[in-house]
Structures are given as C-alpha cells and as structure tokens.
Amino acid sequence: MLTREEFSAILANGPLILDGATGSNLQKAGMPRGCCTEEWILANPEPLVNLQRAYAKAGSRIVYAPTFQAQPIALQALGLDADTEKLNAKLVSLTRAAAPGCLVAGDITTLATFCDSWD
C-alpha cells in the first residue's frame, strides 16, 4: 500500500486515469445478471483479465479490483462472509497480475441493507 507521500509524488507527475465500466462489460462477456460478481470472476477470470489489460493498454494508471460487494454484509446473504478477506485477496491478486505497473484500488458499492432504528 502506498503512503500518502508516495501517492502525492505520483500525482505530482500529472493526472492519473482510472479504468472504466467493469460490471456492464463483464455482463457483455457472459456474466449473468444477479450472480455474485466476485464469485463469478474467480470462476471465470479471463473476461476480467482481458478487460483490465485493455484499460491498462489504453492508458489507465489505476485499475479497480472487482471488490464491489466483497464485504461481510453482502457476502453473508450468500454464506460467504467468513471468506471476505480471502475473496478480496484473490481479487486484488488477479487485478495486479492483469495490470502490472498500474495502481490497484479497492472498490465498494452501496448496499440494499438498512440499519435498525435507534428509536
């Protein structure tokens, strides 16, 4: 992981371009709607690897690891919450291998889960 100073030094060299759409491109590559994206990617890594390589080749210097819902609340519904750390490590490793030389960022999405009322 970069320190704040290391990241600031990278930013001082000019703008950093991030990758683009992942989920919709994975669906175009055959990922079914409504599946666990992270689980599908680990079972079918080639579409993600190809996509991330294409983004890196196009000039992206930061590539998101596909960790959108790889957190305990979302994974609990699938019975995978105990594997949260392992899933994230595999997804980050896959991204690092697909886009060497790029920075890898984690990514998280909103949840359709609500907190209990404090009343």
Language-model region placement:
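Domain-level signal for soluble alpha/beta catalytic cores
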Residues: 1-119
